């Protein structure tokens, strides 16, 4: 399964050409432009949080301490920034952020890439099992 491709397909189904889609993930993922490659021909505008340092801080905080108020605050701040910049649809594309997925701007629709993958695997297992 290709989690990025499946997640982009889900985002495309929930958006229209010209829409802004925000991605909450590690700055390292942004540098690979992996999501941009899949969105390339979609006429969607992809944006990332501007403060890479805070994104890394949130990831490290979750890795070391789990779901903390500080980590939730950092993620909420990033999500709110994306919404303010026009991203009413956001992808949670970091397994650490999946652990605190309720910490996002409530006015934005969220797609968790880990959930998309889990749903695809479950569907595959059900189909493989047969009637």
What are these regions (language model features)?
Residues 1-131:
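Non-catalytic structural scaffold of enzyme domains
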